[in-house]
């Protein structure tokens, strides 16, 4: 039996859960939030009824959801642009896998450079880690090496944002 597109793509990716695409996931209501809390996930209160599940998701295991059968409604219904394009046949599975690998390479590089610049808080969304790393680089003073890493970080983050916008986010997001 041929694996589904989600098995072929989503389980190689994880960008929608690891803080690269989104900073948080809005929950459908208090019952959904309570169910996730019972499973050990931390829910942040906000101005919505259910609150939000901050990213990176605490249920993410590698690139797979550790609570897949019980994941939030927002997660169950989300399909990135790349998955939609693969379903329509406008992108082959092989091309989609290449896009995922390329984006993950840039995300990994952003994380590594952020850490090298002093940002070691791994449980933050990627954009927050990036912003923190830039601030830390500026606070520490400008050495040639730091300036080079800062510029490289900006270039890599630019590549991530371009890829996310063009390949993963739908027009309405």
Model-derived segments and spans:
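Hydrophobic scaffolds flanking metal-cofactor catalytic centers in soluble metalloenzymes
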Residues: 1-173
């Amino acid at each position: 039996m041929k694996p589904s597109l989600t098995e072929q793509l989503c389980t190689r990716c994880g960008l929608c859960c690891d803080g690269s695409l989104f900073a948080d996931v809005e929950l459908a209501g208090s019952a959904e939030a309570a169910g996730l809390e019972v499973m050990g996930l931390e829910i942040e209160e906000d101005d919505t009824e259910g609150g939000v599940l901050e990213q990176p998701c605490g249920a993410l295991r590698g690139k797979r959801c550790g609570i897949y059968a019980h994941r939030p409604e927002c997660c169950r219904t989300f399909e990135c642009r790349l998955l939609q394009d693969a379903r329509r046949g406008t992108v082959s599975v092989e091309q989609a896998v290449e896009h995922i690998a390329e984006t993950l390479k840039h995300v990994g590089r952003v994380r590594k450079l952020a850490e090298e610049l002093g940002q070691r808080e791994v449980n933050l969304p990627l954009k927050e880690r990036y912003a923190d790393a830039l601030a830390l680089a500026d606070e520490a003073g400008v050495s040639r090496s730091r300036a080079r890493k800062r510029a490289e970080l900006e270039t890599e983050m630019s590549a991530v944002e371009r890829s996310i916008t063009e390949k993963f986010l739908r027009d309405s997001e």
